[in-house]
């Protein structure tokens, strides 16, 4: 069982996009029973709020629903619950480390690193470009899936 937690600042744009894109990839491969996939925020700013309309709209364009998702915050105990804690950018990693304190098992990484790329997933909250964010999230999620399953 692979347990993956995607993390961004507010859990309304990038990390829920990654959560639901990864769930879609896994479901289409017939492997949903082999994965636990979730997302959360490092901040408290959006806790309880639904996914941003731009993310919701982009996911709907590709046939993915995220209707019931609400923002939640990362907790220190999440470190023990998940095998992979996947951040969208370096600031997320700094804030993850502030919450979990240490990463002795090497669980924390950047999403794009799983696609053999360096850099961050741009935050569409600031850029307004949900298409570019989706493209990069999809690349990262496909890379992570291949890395874990060999498919």
Regions found by a protein language model. Give the residues of each.
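Conserved active-site segments centered on acidic
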Residues: 1-81, 146-150
